[in-house]
Amino acid sequence: MEPNNSFRVDSEFRYTLFPIFYSIVFVLGVIANSYVLWVFARLYPSKKFNEIKIFMVNLTMADLLFLVTLPLWIVYYYNQGDWILPKFLCNLAGCFFFINTYCSVAFLAVITYNRFQAVTRPIKTAQATTRKRGILLSLIIWVSIVGAASYFFVLDSTNREPNKTGSANITRCFEHYEKGSIPVLTIHIFLVFSFFLVFLIILFCNLVIIRTLLTQQVQIQRNAEVKRRALWMVCTVLAVFIICFVPHHLVQLPWTLAELGFQDTDFHQAINDAHQVTLCLLSTNCVLDPIIYCFLTKKFRKHLTEKLYSMRESRKCSRATSETGTEVVMQLKDVPVKSLKY
C-alpha cells in the first residue's frame, strides 16, 4: 500500500484530557514515589538491600524521571499542542518517557522472576546471595535502555505546522513521522514484539506462582497471610501490565502504520483517538507501582499501616478535643455572669 501524504489528523479532546489527567498523575505520583524512597532510606540501610528491594528502588527512580517531565507535557497540551519551551526540553521529555516505559517493564519483569524463583525454588533462593546480581541486572537495564533512549537526544523532535485555523504555525513535539519511513516502522515493530514477548514470560511466571500457591497446603495462620499477600502481589503486577502497558502496545503498531500513511483517513482518526487514551493509561503506572511495594516488603507495609493508624487517631483526638471544647463553652453559657467574677 502506498503511503497517504495528504491528511493530518488531530484528536482535540486531548487538549482538555491531558492537562487534567497528567496533573492528577503528577501530584499523586510524586507524593507516592517520594514517600517510597523516604521509607526505604529510613527503614533499610543501603548495604542491607536485597535483590527485590534494589529492583523496587530502581523502579521508583524510573517513575520519578517521567514524573518530572509531566509539567512540560501539561504546558504543551494546555497550549493546544504548541511546544513553546526550548527544543532540547522536547528531546528530554521524549527520552524520559521512553526510559520510564521500558525501565518499568524491565524492572517489573525481574521482580516477577524473583518472586517466581522464591515460590518454585524457595530453598535455593533463600541460600543465594542476590544483592550483587540485583545491582548487576539493574545496571544492565539502565545502560541498555538509556543507551537506546539517547537516540531521542539527537533526533529532530519538533516540526512546524499550521494551527487548526491556518492563521499561524505551531511547533509540535514528537508528532511527525516521515511518510513511508521503513526504519521508523522497523523500530516500532521491534519494540512492540519485544514487549509482548516479555509480557508472555511475565504472564507464564505469574500463572505458575498462582498455581503453586493455590495447591500448597497451608499449615499455620502466618503462612496463610504470606500466601494471601503473595497472591495480591501477583494480581497487582498483572493489573499494572494489563491496565498501563498492554493497551498502549496493542495500539502502537496500527497507529504507527497510520502515521506513516499506510492506512485510510477514517481508520487513522479512530486509532489516533485510541492512542491518546492509551498514553493516559500508560502514565498511571507511576501511581500504581507503589501499590506493589505494600505486598513485597513487610516493613514497608507495617510502616504505612502505622502512619495511617496514627493519622486516624490524630483526627479522632482532634475531633474529641473540639467536641469537648464545645461542651465547655455550652456549659459556661448556662453559668450566671456574676458567678464568673472574682
UniProtKB/Swiss-Prot annotation:
It is found in: Cell membrane. Residues 39-54, 114-133, 206-233, 297-342 are cytoplasmic. GO terms for molecular function: G protein-coupled purinergic nucleotide receptor activity; platelet activating factor receptor activity. PANTHER family: P2Y PURINOCEPTOR-RELATED G-PROTEIN COUPLED RECEPTOR, PLATELET-ACTIVATING FACTOR RECEPTOR. GO terms for cellular component: membrane; plasma membrane. It holds the Pfam family 7tm_1. Glycans are attached at N4, N163, N169. Keywords: Cell membrane, Chemotaxis, Disulfide bond, G-protein coupled receptor, Glycoprotein, Membrane, Pregnancy, Receptor, Transducer, Transmembrane, Transmembrane helix. Its main location: membrane. Disulfide bonds join C90-C173. Coiled coil: none annotated. Receptor for platelet activating factor, a chemotactic phospholipid mediator that possesses potent inflammatory, smooth-muscle contractile and hypotensive activity. Seems to mediate its action via a G protein that activates a phosphatidylinositol-calcium second messenger system. May be involved in the morphological and physical modifications of the oviduct and uterus during the estrus cycle and early pregnancy. Interacts with ARRB1. The chain crosses the membrane at residues 17-38, 55-74, 92-113, 134-155, 185-205, 234-254, 277-296. The gene is PTAFR. It is a multi-pass membrane protein. This is Platelet-activating factor receptor. One of its GO terms (biological process) is chemotaxis.
